[in-house]
Amino acid sequence: MKRLGLVILLFAVISCERLGENPVNGSVYLRLDLLNRDKELRGIPSYKTYLYSRPGVDYNPQQGERIGLGGLLVVHTPLAEYRAFDLACPNEQIPNRNTIVEVDANMLNAVCPRCGTKYQILDGSGIALESKKYGLRSYRISVSGNSGIVSN
């Protein structure tokens, strides 16, 4: 009987698919200024995206700041928590800054325009809503008063 239990346990362990590590791995260090540059994040709920620059269109990082592989999405959830995610879709064959998720109109989800994967962001989880391998890559965020830091 013990052997049968051991065989079943071994089979279960071998048959489970290993997800491996999230393929999105960008370097992140971003200072938040909730009084000026990032004041739109003070509202609940709210979000802001930080994209690699196209002159006059997107965010231009300050000296020493890094915004991940595809850019950053910072969310202020209804529970007054801040969360940060990489915008690169982790379920693309080769995640990069050319295929980034976009926040939908009601701010519930972020959606990849290429593969169609939806990620839950309003609750701060970043999980994939369909049966995809990976959720959005999350980063540490620390907010104190009117400033904060996003890092990995």
Show which residues each predicted segment covers.
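C-terminal motif of bacterial Sec signal peptides marking the signal peptidase cleavage site
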Residues: A12-S15
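Short cysteine/histidine-rich metal-coordination sites, predominantly Zn2+-binding motifs
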Residues: V103-C115, G126-Y139
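Short, flexible helix/strand-to-coil boundary loops that buttress conserved ligand/catalytic motifs
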Residues: D123
